[in-house]
C-alpha cells in the first residue's frame, strides 16, 4: 500500500477567541494535537500612538499613555512623567512621590488580580474572576476619587500629580488593606492547591533564565525563571528605595511559578501601600504634591482668580505648553507586566520630537513560538494567560 504524506494542519487561534486576550491572531501549525509552529499576527489594535504624540504638547500627550496598558493606566503615565522630569531636571516633592507610589501599587494589584483570575478562567475555573472583579471595583473607585476617572486617569503629570488626595480617601485605602488579605487567602486556597489548575500549569511554558534574557523578557517573566530583577530595587525611582518589600522569585520558570509570583507580588504591593498610607497620614500629611515651578506646573485655581501672573501662566501652559531642553532620555518603571520604558527625544520645542514606548508585552509575545513549540494545543491558552498580554501596549 502506498505511503501517504501527512501534512501538518494549520489553524487560526483568534482574533475572536475568548482566550486570545483581545485581538491576538495566532496561526498555529499542528501535528495532530502537538504545536509545531506559532505565528503571532499583531497590529489589529494599532493606533499610531507614538506618531500622534509628536503633534501634541508634553502635557497633552499624557492621556495617550493611559490607553496603552489600560488595565493599569497610571503605571504607564509614571514612566512618561519621569522621562519629562529628567529632561526638565525638576524634582517631585515627597508627598507627590508617595501618592505616585501608592497609585502605582494599586495599578499593580489591579493588573495582577485580572491576570491571575483570567489565567484560572483560561484553564476552566470560572469562580476566581468574579471574586477578582469585586476587589478591582473597589480599587477603581479609589482611582475615581483621586482624579474623576475610573480608567483613563491622566493623574500623573510631569512635575508631580494633578491634585492632592483628601485625608478621607487615604484613610479608606488604609481600611481596604486588611480585608484584601482575606480575599487573597480565599483566592489562594481555591486556585493554588487545585489539582486541575496544577496539571494545566506545572512544567508548561518553561523558560530558562538565559533564554529569558535573550528574548528580552522583564518583570514576572524573568523573576519566574530565577532572577531577582525588579527595577524598584535594582534601579530605584521615586521613593521606592525607602520602602520595605521583598521580591518573589520562582525556581522552575513555568506558568505555575509565574502565577505564584503574581500572587505574592500582590501581598508585597499591599505592604508598600500600607507604608505610603502611614506616611501620607503621618509626617507627610501636608506639603505640595507637585513641583512649584509655575513655568511647568499650572498654578492653583484659587491663585488664578486672584493673580494676573497666575492667569497668564495658566493660559500659556494650556495653550502653548512648556519648552523642554533639547536632549534624549530613557526612563523605565517596573510596570505590572514588566519593564515599561519611554525613550524621549526633545528638540527644544514644546512637543516631543520622538517618543518611543518600550512595551513589555511586545517582547513576551514574540517568544510565543519558542514557548509553545512541542506543547499541546490546549497549553497554548495556558501559556498565553501566563504571559499577561494586553493589546493596547503591544500594538500601540
Curated annotation (Swiss-Prot):
UniProt entry tagged with the keyword Heme: no
Bilayer disposition of the protein: Peripheral membrane protein
Cross-referenced InterPro entries: NADH_Q_OxRdtase_suD, NADH_UbQ_OxRdtase_49kDa_CS, NDH1_su_D/H, NiFe-Hase_large
Protein's job: NDH-1 shuttles electrons from NADH, via FMN and iron-sulfur (Fe-S) centers, to quinones in the respiratory chain. The immediate electron acceptor for the enzyme in this species is believed to be ubiquinone. Couples the redox reaction to proton translocation (for every two electrons transferred, four hydrogen ions are translocated across the cytoplasmic membrane), and thus conserves the redox energy in a proton gradient.
Protein's name in the database: NADH-quinone oxidoreductase subunit D
Keyword Cell wall biogenesis/degradation: no
One GO cellular component term noted in the UniProt record for this chain: plasma membrane
Pfam families referenced in this protein's UniProt entry, alphabetically: Complex1_49kDa
EC number: 7.1.1.-
Alphabetical list of PANTHER family matching this protein: NADH DEHYDROGENASE [UBIQUINONE] IRON-SULFUR PROTEIN 2, MITOCHONDRIAL, NADH-UBIQUINONE OXIDOREDUCTASE 49 KDA SUBUNIT
Organism: Brucella melitensis biotype 1 (strain ATCC 23456 / CCUG 17765 / NCTC 10094 / 16M)
Subunit description: NDH-1 is composed of 14 different subunits. Subunits NuoB, C, D, E, F, and G constitute the peripheral sector of the complex.
Organism taxonomic ancestry: Bacteria, Pseudomonadati, Pseudomonadota, Alphaproteobacteria, Hyphomicrobiales
Keywords: Cell inner membrane, Cell membrane, Membrane, NAD, Quinone, Translocase, Transport, Ubiquinone
HAMAP family reported in the protein's UniProt record: NDH1_NuoD (MF_01358)
Primary enzyme class: translocase
Catalytic reaction list: a quinone + NADH + 5 H(+)(in) = a quinol + NAD(+) + 4 H(+)(out)
Molecular function per GO: NAD binding; NADH:ubiquinone reductase (non-electrogenic) activity; quinone binding
Subcellular localization(s) per the UniProt record: Cell inner membrane
Domain of life per record: Bacteria
Homology family: Belongs to the complex I 49 kDa subunit family.
Amino acid at each position: 500500500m502506498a505511503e501517504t504524506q501527512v501534512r501538518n494542519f494549520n489553524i487560526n487561534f483568534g482574533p475572536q477567541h475568548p482566550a486570545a486576550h483581545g485581538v491576538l491572531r495566532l496561526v498555529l501549525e499542528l501535528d495532530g494535537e502537538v504545536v509545531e509552529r506559532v505565528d503571532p499576527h499583531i497590529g489589529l489594535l494599532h493606533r499610531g500612538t507614538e506618531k500622534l504624540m509628536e503633534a501634541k504638547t508634553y502635557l497633552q500627550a499624557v492621556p495617550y499613555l493611559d490607553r496603552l496598558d489600560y488595565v493599569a493606566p497610571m503605571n504607564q503615565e509614571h514612566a512618561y512623567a519621569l522621562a519629562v522630569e529628567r529632561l526638565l531636571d525638576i524634582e517631585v516633592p515627597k508627598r507627590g512621590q508617595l501618592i505616585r507610589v501608592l497609585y502605582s501599587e494599586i495599578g499593580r494589584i489591579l493588573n495582577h488580580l485580572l491576570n491571575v483570575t483570567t489565567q484560572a478562567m483560561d484553564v476552566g475555573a470560572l469562580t476566581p474572576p468574579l471574586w477578582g472583579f469585586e476587589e478591582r471595583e473597589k480599587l477603581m473607585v479609589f482611582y475615581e476619587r483621586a482624579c474623576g476617572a475610573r480608567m483613563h486617569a491622566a493623574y500623573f503629570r510631569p512635575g508631580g500629580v494633578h491634585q492632592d488626595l483628601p485625608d478621607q480617601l487615604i484613610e479608606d485605602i488604609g481600611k481596604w488593606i486588611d480585608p484584601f488579605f482575606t480575599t487573597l487567602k480565599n483566592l489562594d486556597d481555591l486556585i493554588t492547591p487545585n489539582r486541575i489548575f496544577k496539571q494545566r500549569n506545572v512544567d508548561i511554558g518553561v523558560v530558562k533564565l538565559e533564554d529569558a534574557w535573550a528574548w528580552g523578557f522583564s518583570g514576572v517573566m524573568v523573576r519566574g525563571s530565577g532572577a531577582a530583577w525588579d527595577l524598584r530595587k535594582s534601579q530605584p525611582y521615586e521613593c521606592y528605595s525607602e520602602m520595605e518589600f521583598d521580591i518573589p522569585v520562582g525556581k522552575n520558570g513555568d506558568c505555575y511559578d509565574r502565577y505564584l509570583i503574581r500572587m505574592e507580588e500582590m501581598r508585597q504591593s499591599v505592604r508598600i501601600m500600607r507604608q505610603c498610607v502611614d506616611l501620607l497620614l503621618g509626617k507627610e500629611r501636608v506639603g505640595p504634591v507637585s513641583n512649584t515651578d509655575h513655568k511647568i506646573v499650572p498654578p492653583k485655581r484659587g491663585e488664578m482668580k486672584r493673580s494676573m501672573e497666575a492667569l497668564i501662566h495658566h493660559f500659556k501652559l494650556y495653550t502653548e505648553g512648556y519648552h523642554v531642553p533639547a536632549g534624549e532620555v530613557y526612563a523605565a518603571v517596573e510596570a505590572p507586566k514588566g519593564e515599561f520604558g519611554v525613550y524621549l527625544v526633545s528638540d527644544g520645542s514644546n512637543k516631543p520630537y520622538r517618543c518611543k514606548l518600550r512595551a513589555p508585552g511586545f517582547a513576551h509575545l514574540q517568544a510565543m513560538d519558542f514557548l509553545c513549540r512541542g506543547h499541546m494545543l490546549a497549553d497554548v491558552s495556558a501559556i498565553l494567560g501566563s504571559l499577561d498580554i494586553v493589546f493596547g501596549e503591544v500594538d500601540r
